[in-house]
Amino acid sequence: MSKILVLNDKFENSGELELPASYAEVNPHNLYLYVKSYLAGMRANTAHTKSRAYVSGGGKKPWRQKGRGGARAGSTRTNVWVGGAVAFGPTNEKNYFQKVNKKQKRLALECALAQKAEAGKLFAVDSLAVESGKTKDAAKIIEALNLRDALIVKDLLDDKTLLAFRNMANCYVVDASEVNAYLVSVFSSVIVEKAVLQTITKEG
């Protein structure tokens, strides 16, 4: 059974919670499909080459068809000519979007959470608010748990908490409404508020 480590106000272990049994039964392929789709959606699509339709010039036949003893040519902009077009090259018109069903997104998140819980890297606390808005106070949370990096999932993310974690290269803070399977997977540890956990683990 996948267990979530519950922490007190001093970020010390104070108990455990169990994820729904169905989480451990999710096919990991759902997580693979979601991450693949997410990364495809992040592609900038800047690679671009010009085909013969877009290369300037080359409209005039460079020499007559017969009689010179050389190979025939109809344009100076074919892909075999220097300064010519590119054959079958990438264009910025390509759409890399990969559809993932809503149910698959949900299953992917469940699988990612189950994997983190199984590894003992999913933590739940009452509150992650950093009222001072200072990075040094936010860093104490990570130092107390001795974590390399962490995804911080906050219920109703406020500006001060965002400012506190924003300067930390090994942390990323996100509102509960924006958490997804990719973010859960890419960080070695996940810290969530209990209220968030009750929402995202609600079955059905």
Curated annotation (Swiss-Prot):
Pfam family, one: Ribosomal_L4
InterPro entries the UniProt entry points to: Ribosomal_uL4, Ribosomal_uL4-like, Ribosomal_uL4_dom_sf
Top-level taxon of origin: Bacteria
UniProt keywords, alphabetically: Ribonucleoprotein, Ribosomal protein, RNA-binding, rRNA-binding
Quaternary context: Part of the 50S ribosomal subunit.
UniProt-listed NCBIfam families: rplD_bact
Protein family (similarity comment): Belongs to the universal ribosomal protein uL4 family.
Protein name per UniProt: Large ribosomal subunit protein uL4
Top-level taxonomy: Bacteria, Pseudomonadati, Campylobacterota, Epsilonproteobacteria, Campylobacterales
